[in-house]
């Protein structure tokens, strides 16, 4: 008898097979005399569509809503049916005694496996592999510590409740809004509050009125001293009177203080922090960073599990710290890493805290030595960010003297502040020498100083910045800082539940909002589009607040802990859905396509709408039941021969033209000719045709499946 191992992806299945010497390759699985290892392809099973409950639901009608099944159904995803059949036959194979769930260690990973087992009518006992990296060592240790699958039943119940609730609320709210206003509109408990978050920041900027204020400083002994009372003032005459009173006077040092202090590095990375830093440093979008992390985790085995919200490690990992240091010695950090090998590490390290790790610890390097030359430029950048942050946290703290000197001039006090490094510590990664300020060493209390210059400076308060992809991600994590919530309990709920969405879903949500044209980015500034503003006006108010998702996450966490009933949660979601649908039905508002063009749809003759996508623009028919789309422009990977920037594609077919911001223009024929000897860089006719014929759709269009066959 054998154990069947179900991994979430083929790459992880192969890793497990290699580690456990499961070498006999079959069609969709590996096998030896002890194990069979197979895999999903992400989800193999999903929730049924409304029309799979009742064929009449294929036509979207407002009067049919709400659609609330008594019992939710699941279906096998058509494009992965073959692999499901393989997994199903293995589950029910007589030579299989038990199932080892080896999908991602978390709520969604549990759901992937349990839906498959449920659909295959599994009756066999289950065990759970729970690991945070897929190195040989981690897999072996995980198999030595397999847990009873029943221990994770509540995790599955929470995952299933989340999935069903999202279906019930999302399907009904989207269908209600779309049919009510005859437009492709979408609502969701995560995406709608995110639009609101961007709009609130936009309103704050629009309503901001700059305020002028003044500060005063003076120079003495080559140092700059700042006025302390007042530090700043809106009335310039107040500071002018002080200047007049002290003009021509010398000062004396009233006090000198030197305080020894320590500074510690930033915390180990969780996913959100890493995505935000990658955007700041390399202008990588959250989705790009996550995809790169997945490759580093799955293919290269260089980093631990990426979808984590923790900045800490557990104490059982302390013994592995030096092995990970050895791994990063294969990089440019070699000398710094080697210097830390003589240290003794313990569970008292500031980044070790079992209570602050739930499913997964912080993102850190694995024990696998990287070959940087085998990584892409993006992979190398992300890996080095993780390796450097890890090394910083293992190095001693930065030590310095905080110096404060008070200079008395007449009746007024001015202060000079500085920091003098005594030990570089972790900052040795960035700096190569310790700072010395000899001027300060020559000063003592009572020393008289001549004032050489007195300056009054004018300043102006600035509006908060627009969100970019990195800062929006961080705001979604802490929405209580932006929403005005009168009840402090709600603040705590949002903080405790991790804000809007999860670390695993936020990047997808932002991407989806771009693709559905609810938000747009101009010069890195994210703004709400006219469509997004109207969605906020038309949506039931509770769907625009982050409180709904916070309340959900709070109850889902209780379900995980066995303290709340999943069926009760679903009943509440059904009641809420009824309220949402009724509110939309009774609304007397209107939706206006203000991005309507005078271009007629070649299929139905109605005017088309200009839609901005993340990589360009396209025309989409305003009629939801007509799926006609036409590309206007699209940023490509083709590089300008003059300035080497990416060129934008206009038109299609023989009329296609590539233009660069520097003014260079090429036809498709010229582009083909220029690249005929550079096949790897070529934007050829075949690729162009494939792009043009791919339904001319918006990238990752969230409505493509939901709206096909839509009739009113």
From Swiss-Prot:
A biological process from GO: DNA recombination
Keywords: DNA-binding, Isomerase, Magnesium, Metal-binding, Topoisomerase
This protein's record includes keyword Aminoacyl-tRNA synthetase: no
Residue stretches making up the Toprim domain: 2-135
Catalysed reactions listed for this entry: ATP-independent breakage of single-stranded DNA, followed by passage and rejoining
Top EC class for this record: isomerase
SUPFAM superfamilies registered for this protein in UniProt: Prokaryotic type I DNA topoisomerase
Cofactor annotation: Mg(2+)
InterPro entries (UniProt xref): Topo_IA (IPR000380), Topo_IA_2 (IPR003601), Topo_IA_AS (IPR023406), Topo_IA_cen (IPR013497), Topo_IA_cen_sub1 (IPR013824), Topo_IA_cen_sub2 (IPR013825), Topo_IA_cen_sub3 (IPR013826), Topo_IA_core_domain (IPR023405)
PROSITE patterns in UniProt: TOPO_IA_1 (PS00396), TOPO_IA_2 (PS52039), TOPRIM (PS50880)
GO CC annotation: cytoplasmic replication fork
Record-listed E.C. numbers: 5.6.2.1
Topo IA-type catalytic domain segment(s): 152-581
Record-level Gene Ontology MF annotations: DNA binding; DNA topoisomerase type I (single strand cut, ATP-independent) activity; magnesium ion binding
Region annotation (Interaction with DNA) ranges: 186-191
Superkingdom to which the source organism belongs: Bacteria
Residues binding Mg(2+): 8, 104
Residues the UniProt record annotates as site (Interaction with DNA): 60, 167, 175, 307
Residues annotated as catalytic: 305
Its biological purpose: Releases the supercoiling and torsional tension of DNA, which is introduced during the DNA replication and transcription, by transiently cleaving and rejoining one strand of the DNA duplex. Introduces a single-strand break via transesterification at a target site in duplex DNA. The scissile phosphodiester is attacked by the catalytic tyrosine of the enzyme, resulting in the formation of a DNA-(5'-phosphotyrosyl)-enzyme intermediate and the expulsion of a 3'-OH DNA strand. The free DNA strand then undergoes passage around the unbroken strand, thus removing DNA supercoils.
Entry similarity comment: Belongs to the type IA topoisomerase family.
Name of the featured protein: DNA topoisomerase 3
Source organism phylogeny: Bacteria, Bacillati, Bacillota, Bacilli, Bacillales
């Amino acid at each position: 008898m054998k154990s069947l191992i179900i991994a979430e992806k083929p790459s992880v299945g192969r890793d497990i097979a290699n580690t456990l010497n499961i070498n006999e390759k079959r069609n969709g699985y590996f096998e030896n005399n002890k194990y069979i290892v197979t895999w999903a392809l992400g989800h193999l099973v999903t929730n049924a569509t409304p029309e799979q409950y009742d064929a009449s639901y294929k036509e979207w009608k407002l009067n049919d809503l709400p659609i609330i099944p008594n019992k939710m159904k699941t279906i096998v995803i058509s494009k992965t049916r073959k692999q499901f059949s393989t997994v199903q036959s293995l589950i029910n194979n007589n030579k299989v005694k038990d199932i080892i769930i080896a999908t991602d260690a978390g709520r969604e990973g549990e759901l992937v496996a349990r839906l498959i087992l449920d659909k295959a009518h599994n009756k066999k006992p289950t065990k759970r592999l729970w690991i945070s990296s897929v190195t040989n060592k981690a897999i072996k240790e995980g198999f030595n510590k397999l847990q009873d699958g029943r221990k994770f039943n509540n995790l599955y119940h929470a995952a299933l409740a989340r999935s069903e609730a999202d279906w019930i609320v999302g399907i009904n709210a989207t269908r209600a809004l779309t049919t009510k206003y005859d437009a492709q509109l979408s609502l969701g408990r995560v995406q709608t509050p995110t639009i609101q978050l961007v709009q609130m920041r936009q309103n704050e900027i629009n309503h901001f009125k700059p305020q002028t204020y003044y500060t005063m400083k003076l120079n003495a002994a080559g140092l700059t001293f700042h006025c302390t009372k007042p530090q700043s003032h809106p009335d310039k005459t107040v500071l002018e009177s002080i200047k007049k009173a002290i003009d021509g006077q010398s000062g004396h040092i009233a006090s000198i203080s030197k305080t020894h202090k320590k500074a510690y590095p930033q915390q180990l990375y969780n996913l959100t922090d890493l995505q935000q830093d990658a955007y700041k440093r390399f202008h990588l979008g959250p989705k790009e960073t996550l995809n790169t992390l997945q490759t580093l985790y799955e293919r290269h085995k260089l980093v631990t599990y990426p979808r984590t919200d923790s900045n800490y490690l557990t104490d059982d990992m302390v013994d592995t710290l030096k092995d990970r240091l050895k791994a990063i010695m294969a990089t440019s950090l070699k000398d710094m890493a080697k210097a830390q090998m003589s240290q003794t590490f313990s569970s008292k390290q500031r980044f070790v805290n079992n209570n602050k790790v739930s499913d997964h610890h912080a993102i850190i390097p694995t024990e696998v030595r990287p070959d940087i030359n085998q990584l892409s430029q993006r992979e190398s950048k992300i890996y080095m960010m993780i390796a450097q942050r890890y090394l910083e946290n293992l190095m001693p703290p930065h030590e310095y003297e905080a110096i404060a000197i008070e200079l008395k001039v007449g009746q007024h006090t001015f202060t000079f502040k500085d920091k003098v490094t005594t030990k570089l510590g972790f900052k040795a990664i960035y700096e190569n020498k310790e700072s010395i300020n000899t001027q300060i060493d020559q000063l003592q209390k009572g020393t008289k100083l001549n004032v050489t210059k007195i300056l009054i400076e004018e300043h102006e308060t600035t509006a908060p910045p627009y969100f970019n992809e990195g800062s929006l991600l961080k705001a979604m994590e802490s929405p209580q800082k932006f929403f005005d919530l009168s009840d402090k309990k709600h603040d705590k709920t949002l903080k405790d539940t991790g804000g809007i969405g999860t670390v695993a879903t936020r990047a997808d949500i932002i991407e989806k909002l771009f693709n559905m044209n609810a938000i747009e980015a101009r010069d890195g500034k994210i703004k709400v589009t006219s469509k997004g503003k109207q969605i906020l006006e038309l949506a039931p108010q509770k769907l625009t607040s982050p409180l709904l998702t916070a309340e959900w996450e709070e109850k889902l966490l209780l379900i995980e802990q066995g303290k709340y009933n999943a069926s009760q949660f679903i009943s509440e979601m059904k009641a809420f859905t009824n309220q949402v649908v009724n509110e939309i039905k009774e609304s007397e508002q209107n939706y206006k396509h203000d991005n309507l063009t005078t271009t007629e749809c070649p299929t139905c003759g109605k005017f088309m709408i200009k839609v901005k996508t993340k990589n360009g623009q396209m025309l989409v028919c305003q009629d939801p039941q007509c799926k006609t789309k036409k590309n206007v422009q699209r940023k490509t990977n083709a590089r300008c021969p003059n300035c080497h920037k990416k060129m934008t594609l206009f038109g299609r077919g023989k009329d296609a033209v590539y233009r660069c911001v520097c003014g260079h223009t090429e036809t498709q024929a010229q582009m083909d000719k220029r690249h005929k000897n550079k096949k790897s860089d070529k934007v050829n006719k075949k690729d162009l045709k494939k792009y043009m014929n791919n339904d001319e759709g918006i990238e990752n269009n969230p409505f493509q499946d939901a709206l096909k066959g839509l009739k009113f």
